[in-house]
């Protein structure tokens, strides 16, 4: 699909950047000659806009070998960022998709500035080509034909091998993010814990990773009472899924991802209202993020050891379901008083984190659609983060800045720990109250990370989008897939 060339050839469409300061770039000047001065007229009349994310289409009318030019406005160079570029190109690829373009090229060097080099631009272009044109996988009987972009050429004077590598990495990041989106969008009667485990096993086998899938009996032997409690009401068996990627000769410096895999959440006996229950098929967004990251890792083979652990079940009501006031014993040996059965994700993660440590994780990053409180605090575009290790958090933060997946650190104070440890009957309680809800949930999980360096990522607000946007349709976003993978890639470079 991807090609790199130094000279522009015949294409259906060519994408060109327009900055405010460069309305007459060398390429535009040369092209203007072919257009007999008409491009300059369009610029002066503002028919070609330099405003951020403005897309202006110009038909060559046979004056060049290119059928149409798509000029992408990027605003002022001083405010040009990777986020601007991602949004602008995402919108551009959506436009090309709508026009059913099959052969497109991008004038890569026109997007290059002192801030962003050609490798950056190539990576982002290939990444958002997949993200921006992603379509929901539906179950409708009337399937519409989709015209795909079959050939995408980067025109640049830079080293072709380096640009090809950047295009490949970007493409893999975008594709794996879309894989996670598809998982999150799947209905709960299709994506059960068993089906999620089967998907994980297929992924592991494809990329020659080791894996384990613990069944209920094995969990009972290991004392995974927290995950098993959540599963009590279900007819679907629980799964504790582990993927093991060995990027080094020795099993050291192991990064452990733990993704919440609640395939449907009714709230249990702490029952959600109807409007709060619809959409809870997406409560396994953390698991999807972890699996998406492992897809990237499997493709790119970084020199880093990684474990991905997914505790998976649904949380439903029945005569056997766990109840408020129950006291359960986690794999760690810590006992938990259940005050809220709708705070089930942290229970599953408690055993997931303990299991990841048992498998050898030296660093822990958990990802979960955990609390509505984080949405109240940070909105729908920023992931909440908590940590017991600032050095690890800084590495996660740097990765998130590189991928434009915003995160913001929330605090853990001793008084927060006291609140989750406040129980007359057990070591911990799973829900101290609504105040500081996101912080309480993260603090609870931290009790199981203990002294292992740990970062918690609450993606309840960022895992799904209520409306279409430049990087995709409404629905699942694949939040944190690219950040997790980038973190591992950077670890591997050290």
Swiss-Prot record:
List the subcellular locations. Answer: Cytoplasm
Query: Which residues of this protein are catalytic?
Result: 272, 346
> Which domain of life does the protein's organism represent?
Bacteria
What remark does the entry make about the cofactor?
A: Binds 2 manganese ions per subunit.
Q: Which CDD domains match?
A: Peptidase_M17
Matching entries from Pfam families are given as:
Peptidase_M17 (PF00883), Peptidase_M17_N (PF02789)
Its EC top class is hydrolase
Q: Which reaction does it catalyse?
A: Release of an N-terminal amino acid, Xaa-|-Yaa-, in which Xaa is preferably Leu, but may be other amino acids including Pro although not Arg or Lys, and Yaa may be Pro. Amino acid amides and methyl esters are also readily hydrolyzed, but rates on arylamides are exceedingly low; Release of an N-terminal amino acid, preferentially leucine, but not glutamic or aspartic acids
| EC number annotated for this UniProt entry | 3.4.11.1, 3.4.11.10
Coiled-coil stretches: none
Record: residues binding Mn(2+) 2:
260, 265, 283, 344
User: Which InterPro entries does this one have?
Assistant: Leucine_aapep/pepB, Macro_dom-like, Peptidase_M17_C, Peptidase_M17_leu_NH2_pept, Peptidase_M17_N
Supply the alphabetized keyword list: Aminopeptidase, Cytoplasm, Hydrolase, Manganese, Metal-binding, Protease
Q: Where does Mn(2+) 1 bind?
A: 265, 342, 344
What biological-process terms (Gene Ontology) are attached? proteolysis
Main site of residence? cytoplasm
Gene Ontology cellular-component annotations: cytoplasm
Cofactors required: Mn(2+)
One GO term in the molecular function aspect is: metalloaminopeptidase activity
**PANTHER family, sorted:** CYTOSOL AMINOPEPTIDASE (PTHR11963:SF23), LEUCINE AMINOPEPTIDASE-RELATED (PTHR11963)
Biological role: Presumably involved in the processing and regular turnover of intracellular proteins. Catalyzes the removal of unsubstituted N-terminal amino acids from various peptides.
Q: List the HAMAP family hit by this protein, alphabetically.
A: Cytosol_peptidase_M17
Family as reported in the entry's similarity comment: Belongs to the peptidase M17 family.
- Name assigned to this protein: Probable cytosol aminopeptidase
Q: What is the lineage of its organism?
A: Bacteria, Bacillati, Bacillota, Bacilli, Bacillales
């Amino acid at each position: 699909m991807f090609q790199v060339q130094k000279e522009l050839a015949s294409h259906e469409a060519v994408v060109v950047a327009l900055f405010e300061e460069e309305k007459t770039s060398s390429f535009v000047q040369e092209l203007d000659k072919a257009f007999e001065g008409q491009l300059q007229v369009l610029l002066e009349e503002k028919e070609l806009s330099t405003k951020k994310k403005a897309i202006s289409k110009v038909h060559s009318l046979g004056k060049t070998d290119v059928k149409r030019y798509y000029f992408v406005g990027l605003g002022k160079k001083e405010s040009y960022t990777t986020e601007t570029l991602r949004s602008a190109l995402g919108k551009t690829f959506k436009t090309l998709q709508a026009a059913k373009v099959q052969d497109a090229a991008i004038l890569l060097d026109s997007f290059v500035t002192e801030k962003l080099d050609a490798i950056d631009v190539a990576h982002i272009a290939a990444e958002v080509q997949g993200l921006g044109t992603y379509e929901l996988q539906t179950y409708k009987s009337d399937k519409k034909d989709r015209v795909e972009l079959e050939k995408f050429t980067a025109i640049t004077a830079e080293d072709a091998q380096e640009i090809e590598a950047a295009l490949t990495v970007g493409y893999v990041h975008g594709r794996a993010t879309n894989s996670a989106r598809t998982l999150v969008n799947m209905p709960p009667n299709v994506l059960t814990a068993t089906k999620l485990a089967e998907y994980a096993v297929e992924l592991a086998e494809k990329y020659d990773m080791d894996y384990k899938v613990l069944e209920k009996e094995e969990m009972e032997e290991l004392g995974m009472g927290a995950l098993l409690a959540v599963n009590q009401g279900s007819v679907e068996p629980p799964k504790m899924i582990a993927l093991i990627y060995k990027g080094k000769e020795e099993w050291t410096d192991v990064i452990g991802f733990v993704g919440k895999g609640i395939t449907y959440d009714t709230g249990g006996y702490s029952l959600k209202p109807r409007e709060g229950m619809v959409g809870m098929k997406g409560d396994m967004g953390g698991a999807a993020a972890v699996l998406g990251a492992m897809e990237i890792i499997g493709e790119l083979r970084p020199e880093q050891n990684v474990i991905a652990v997914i505790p998976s079940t649904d949380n439903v009501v029945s005569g056997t379901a766990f109840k408020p006031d129950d006291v359960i014993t986690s794999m760690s040996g810590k006992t938990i008083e259940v005050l809220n059965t709708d705070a089930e994700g942290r229970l599953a993660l408690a055993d997931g984190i303990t299991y990841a440590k048992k498998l050898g994780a030296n660093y822990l990053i958990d990802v979960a659609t955990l609390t509505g409180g984080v949405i109240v605090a940070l909105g729908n575009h920023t992931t909440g983060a908590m940590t017991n290790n600032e050095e690890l958090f800084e590495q996660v933060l740097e990765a998130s800045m590189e991928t434009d997946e915003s995160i913001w650190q929330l605090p853990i104070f001793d008084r927060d720990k006291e609140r989750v440890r406040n129980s007359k009957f057990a070591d911990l309680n799973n829900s101290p109250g609504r105040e500081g809800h996101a912080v309480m949930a993260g603090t609870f999980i931290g009790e199981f990370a203990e002294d292992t360096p740990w970062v918690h990522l609450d993606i309840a607000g960022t895992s799904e989008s209520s409306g279409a946007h430049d990087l995709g349709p409404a629905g699942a976003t694949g939040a944190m897939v690219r950040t997790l993978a980038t973190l591992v890639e950077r670890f591997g470079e050290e």
